[in-house]
């Protein structure tokens, strides 16, 4: 199976979601699947051949931490090109409604999509303001996973 995985957080910094994505990709490889990963990363960051950089990220204070995300028209084009080139049987997006490359990939996705949610949080003004944009995106998900 051809599997595309999208990580919203930059591979320039170490974090739990990045580790989860890399461990998942490694296990899927071991099980015989073809895997490609798309994530923010600077040009200086060494990446495995199967990881594609979505471009540089910016640091944004979020949920008591700092999230290194990327977004915008250029990132959206990179995500579409990656999706087209990958011709994935399934797409697995981590934090699919976080404003980063994952959200852009979800907008462009045409096949089955699994969304994994890593962060639990109380209601927030940001989530409330983004709700009109995120509800249609949530409906595109074929399956949802919550990490405990």
Regions found by a protein language model. Give the residues of each.
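Conserved alpha-helical elements of sugar-nucleotide-dependent glycosyltransferases
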Residues: 16-27, 101, 130
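Histidine-centered beta-alpha loop that forms part of the nucleotide-sugar donor binding/catalytic region
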Residues: 8, 94-95, 117-121
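A short helix->loop->beta-strand "cap" motif at the edges of active sites that frequently abuts
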Residues: 110-112, 141-142
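Membrane-proximal helix-turn-helix segments that form the acceptor-binding/catalytic region
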Residues: 121, 127-146
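N-terminal strand-loop element at the rim of the active site
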Residues: 7-12, 22, 26-74
């Amino acid at each position: 199976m051809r599997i595309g995985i999208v990580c919203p957080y930059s591979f320039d910094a170490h974090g739990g979601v990045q580790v989860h994505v890399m461990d998942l990709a490694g296990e899927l490889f071991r099980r015989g699947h073809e895997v490609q990963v798309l994530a923010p990363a600077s040009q200086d960051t060494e990446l495995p051949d199967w990881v594609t950089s979505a471009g540089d990220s910016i640091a944004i204070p979020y949920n008591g931490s700092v999230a290194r995300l990327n977004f915008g028209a250029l990132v959206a084009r990179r995500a579409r090109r990656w999706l087209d080139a990958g011709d994935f049987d399934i797409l697995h997006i981590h934090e699919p409604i976080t404003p980063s490359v994952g959200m852009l990939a979800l907008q462009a996705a045409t096949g089955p999509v699994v969304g994994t949610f890593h962060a639990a949080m109380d209601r927030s003004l940001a989530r409330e303001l983004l709700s009109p944009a995120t509800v249609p995106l949530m409906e595109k998900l074929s399956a949802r996973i919550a990490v405990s």
